[in-house]
Swiss-Prot record:
It catalyses: XMP + L-glutamine + ATP + H2O = GMP + L-glutamate + AMP + diphosphate + 2 H(+). It comes from Methanocella arvoryzae (strain DSM 22066 / NBRC 105507 / MRE50). Coiled coil: none annotated. This is GMP synthase [glutamine-hydrolyzing] subunit B. Its EC number is 6.3.5.2. Catalyzes the synthesis of GMP from XMP. It is an enzyme of class 6 (ligase). Keywords: ATP-binding, GMP biosynthesis, Ligase, Nucleotide-binding, Purine biosynthesis.
Amino acid sequence: MVDANAFIDEAIADIKLKVGNGKALIALSGGVDSSVCAILAHRALGDRLIPVYVDTGLMRKGETDRIREIFKFMNPHVVDASDRFFNALKGVTDPEAKRKIVGEMFIRVFEDVVKGLEVDFLIQGTIYPDRIESEGGIKSHHNVGGLPSVTEFKGIIEPLQDLYKDEVREVARALPLPEEISERMPFPGPGLSVRVIGEVTREKIAVVREANAIVEQELVHQFKPWQCLAALLEKGTGVKGDNRCHGWIIAVRAVESRDAMTANHMELPWETLNKISSRITSEIPSVARVVYDITPKPPATIEFE
């Protein structure tokens, strides 16, 4: 396990050394990884840190307002780039291609933000499992294998690249960060795009965003999963009232894990699963069916794409 206090001192010193008298951009997402990086970088660089949150249109319900509130002391740049992301993802169905497109779009948006500001470095919250999955060919993470090979930044700084998620949480507690951040569930960098099987559209994202909100409301506080989510699969036949319908299929997933390298499904009570199914199909009229995924990792990954 990591010595959190020693790590904090070393990370701050390393950021100072690498950036020197220059400036750096920190990519905020609201998750524990980027939040820890943001605090470390802010302590190292102060006003020479440019915090940026990109609203991709692929985020969780209420996420942008939450970011504004939590990081208001940093006065972050909030960029609505949703049109750019949806346009770039139009017609794309391959999961790996989606991840690479999202990674490239993030970099291009960051480059636009810092034009004329003489910012040489990008700081991001890559952690060890991200590197393992990307380098091992399992899936490209938007902040590793999904990054373009050519960028305007002179260097990318990844203070957490050798830490597992549970170690990042230890650092978060030592900083200290509020529990709502230090204990927050992982959320994929490419956002809800990897919870939509096939082409990403605004309609599909709206459906899966509401479904994810319901799943989190029903599971997070009571059962404390490592991660829980809803993914949109395809359409299937259902019945609404006395009429046949052709609606979306939503897959619910909740897992237990320590480091995200392996995971097992949570054995949730039937009444909880029934409530989730009932809420999703009644509150989202375009959904016809809800299923629960019990596949461990391996052979499955935690996310669907």
